[in-house]
Amino acid sequence: MTNKEIESYRNSYKVVNGIGFCRVNNDINGNPRYVVHFLAFTTDEEMRNDNLSQRQLYAIAKKRANYLGFSVYRANWYGGGFVGQSYSLVDTANMINEIVNK
């Protein structure tokens, strides 16, 4: 990454209620989109469970992310993320925390 790309990433990354959001380009309709790492959709207990593989953790996270309207983010620079629309990161973070802690 170049210094310009690093600075751009720093400016587009926000942490809200313990969840990191990375701003990406708007969708085709102009709605703001954010990428969230898949581990934000898992509990600490699930991450510490040695019986769950990374693939199983990802499957759990994907089910929760899809329920909230997120889809798999396929860009190579950000591995293991889900992308969704959000006009309010606080509300989105609260929804993620609510479904994870259900």
Predicted regions, residues:
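Acidic, low-complexity, intrinsically disordered interaction modules
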Residues: 24-91
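Basic, glycine-rich
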Residues: 92, 96
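Short acidic DE-rich linear segments
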Residues: 101-102
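N-terminal acidic leader/helix
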Residues: 18-19
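Absolute N-terminal positional cue centered near the fourth residue
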Residues: 3-4, 50, 98
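Negatively charged, low-complexity tracts enriched in Asp/Glu with abundant Ser/Thr
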Residues: 2-13
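A residue-level detector for conformationally permissive "hinge/kink" positions
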Residues: 10-12, 22, 61
